[in-house]
Amino acid sequence: MEGPEIKAVEAVIDNGSFGKRTLRFETGRLAQQADGAVAAYLDDDSMILSTTTAGSSPKENYDFFPLTVDVEEKMYAAGKIPGSFFRREGRPSSEAILACRIIDRPLRPLFPHTLRNEVQVVETVLAVNPDDAYDVIALNAASASTMISGLPFEGPVSGVRLALIDGQWVAFPRWSERERAVFEIVVAGRVVENGDVAIAMIEAGAGKNAWHLIYDEGQTKPDEEVVAGGLEAAKPFIKVICEAQDELKKIAAKETKEFQLFPEYTDELYARIDEIAHKDLDEALSIAEKLPRQDRIHEIKEHVREVLADEFTDMDDAEKDKELGNAFKELQRQIVRRRILTEDYRIDGRGLRDIRTLSAEVDIVPRVHGSALFQRGETQILGVTTLNMLKMEQQIDALSGPQSKRYMHNYEMPPYSTGETGRVGSPKRREIGHGALAEKALVPVLPSREEFPYAIRQVSEAIGSNGSTSMGSVCASTLSLLAAGVPLKAPVAGIAMGLVSGDVDGQHIFKTLTDILGAEDAFGDMDFKVAGTSEFITALQLDTKLDGIPADILAAALQQAKEARATILEVINECIDGPAEMSEFAPRIITTSVPVEKIGEVIGPKGKMINQIQEDTGAEIAIEDDGTVFISSEGGEAAKKAKSIIDSIANPHVPEAGETYNGKVVKTTSFGAFVNLTPGTDGLLHISQIRNLANGERIDAVEDVLREGDTVEVIVQGVDDRGKISLAIPGFEDQENNARPSRGDRDDRRGGRGRGDRDDRRGGRGRRSDRDDRDFDDRDDRPRRRRSDDFEDDYDDRPRRRRSDDRDFDRDDRDDDRPRRRRSADRDFDDRDDRDARDSRDDDRPRRRRSADRDDRGDRDDRRGGFRGGRGRGSDRNPRYATDDNYDDYRADREERTERPRRRVRRDFDPFED
């Protein structure tokens, strides 16, 4: 089957020892109904679909060019399912918004500014290698799709990311390679008529490991000369990609369509306004203060409107008012630019290199962890720092690159900062971009996680705006971070540079401005923001209204910015020269480490142990996979307490006899209470010891004296071979616990009711032969029943009892007069009369109740109500004392009875088992 005709071109990027990268543009297969559609591939591994579409008709009442750039991150591109509730993509991420800005800024100046048809560029990320960033690929794809769309576009423009790695500028570096980057720079530009590359956009910053690489490994410092060299290094790569786009245009571009352009004003209207208002505007544009200047300009505009009310009657009122506003604004622009180019005179009277009045102050907001106010002229920034546990660092659901960050910089500019009203709430693209730039400027000087184990949120509130609030945010953030006690490696300052270009006496000249005002930003050709320490640059951003700026002009602007940066750093150092003491309201975080195999013990089943530690101490605990533990609390005392508990779990101390503890009751039973001595270590305080807390009086239940959660002072009475700990009340440690001794290998009864492992019968009554409170000496003359120790004395004198495999079960030939013991084989359990015959006993002893007529046994799950907590009250076992009224008689009778031999019972038979 015949398919669509696919056309493709390639651009090969040679990085020398770092290998080659191939950027391929393909069109004809996808999105065939868009005006322009290009699929861009990087090494056939990452794929971006770019489409450019224009509206069929111009937008009415628009006085600007309506260009929209959108980036659609598809999670399937990285083999992921979206983490949202509905499991589908939603609002764009911050990374997508920053990519939109990188694309929009170099594209917008290349369209006619009088075009009013809406143009939309959509970048869809279809596939991405986790080791590659997609933003620069999308920038090149956007230019390519616009080039073939038939729109009036003065392209191509192309972009490249360079990273300074081991002294070499590497194009399209991978994320793994960027770990060793001292500096990264994204440069976009276009080839001009003389074959040179004019730079249209810059976004740059030092690497997050730059400080270590520079000062510990001796790598190249990204100062002004090095960064200028990076701009030059980008030109060959930009030229190669632009040539590929030109080739694609030749083979696949549509014919350029005719679009209606809307001039902002007529030449006649501009000349008339210049005649009326030039002198007044010239004076008004010399007023230094922003608001008085704006008020005076508004008065002049109203005067012009009144004068022209009866003129230009061929235009309707709305059209006339719009053109009047555009022409009036253009007149202001020309006055400001002319004075700068010819007189080196600026609006507020400063020279080209002068900085406005500076002021800095810290600790102006109570209770917050750190705060500062930085003011430059009428630009005023409030910086606020918040510290917290590392578990509060931001998790990023990105297609590639870092998945978390511990330093988060949020920039906010409310409408009142310019004396206006407007929407407040969620951040706009501009606010996200400014916050990212300020964040980029400060990341290289932050302490490492090991040096300062905190998540840091920095908020910059632009509460007054008249030029370069983003660079003011960098200065305010430095002050605020130091005030919060963050040990920055060096203070950082930022400055915004401007540019005005034009022809003077037949020569095209450029004038660079330091610390631009808002009006100079609006009327100038460039907004060039530079941030850094006293020794190197940490962040750069360039936006321009020109088609491009020569690299040598930018290099000179970098040197001019360095002078201004040094002046601002002096003011910062005078205000605060180092990290202050941390606020009393800031959490104190201490660290410890546990062996990886002990992490489970610290956390406990379902987090029980770690939650208990946090509840008991009030500290917050976070454990990393390598066993590093971060503990946080206000004031630090709770954190120290939690650390000691965690250390005791990781390196447990086994309690020894004689040691005293203030333990917490964690469980009560019928035979005693379990007391927690150290995390994960409990001991048993027997009920006989608990009586000592009640002045030795008898207690019916442990809960009458101790309850779960109570604290009790105990002493370790002993530790058996299996690590079971017996506790006592101090002063009574020599008192023996009245616990039932071992009956074979019976282990701990606290679990199931198994009968094979019963060494520890805590809380039971012991075996019959060992019940100390029975006195059998005063009984009648009946021969005592032999106990187990009697059998040892005459064992050798008795005939060996035949085992089941060699004895004759017919015992009719026995040599004694005892009736033979009936075997289960010949018992007729249906004959109830034979059983009743046994009730006619020849003594006065009450017959032993059989299981058939023991009505009171019932459900024995709760055995705490019985006498001595194990087998029911004696009155329940002897019908003679069946009522509670006779209980005292029962006790007295027991004291008078003589010892009788223990009745032999098979070892595996317990008549009181359920």
From Swiss-Prot:
The keyword Cytoplasm applies. Belongs to the polyribonucleotide nucleotidyltransferase family. Mg(2+) binds at residues 521, 527. One of its GO terms (molecular function) is polyribonucleotide nucleotidyltransferase activity. InterPro entries: ExoRNase_PH_dom1 (IPR001247), ExoRNase_PH_dom2_sf (IPR036345), GPSI/PNP (IPR014069), KH_dom (IPR004087), KH_dom_type_1 (IPR004088), KH_dom_type_1_sf (IPR036612), NA-bd_OB-fold (IPR012340), PNPase (IPR012162). Its EC number is 2.7.7.8. Residues 658-730 form the S1 motif domain. Residues 742-789, 797-865, 873-899 have a biased composition (Basic and acidic residues). Involved in mRNA degradation. Catalyzes the phosphorolysis of single-stranded polyribonucleotides processively in the 3'- to 5'-direction. This is Polyribonucleotide nucleotidyltransferase. GO terms for cellular component: cytosol.
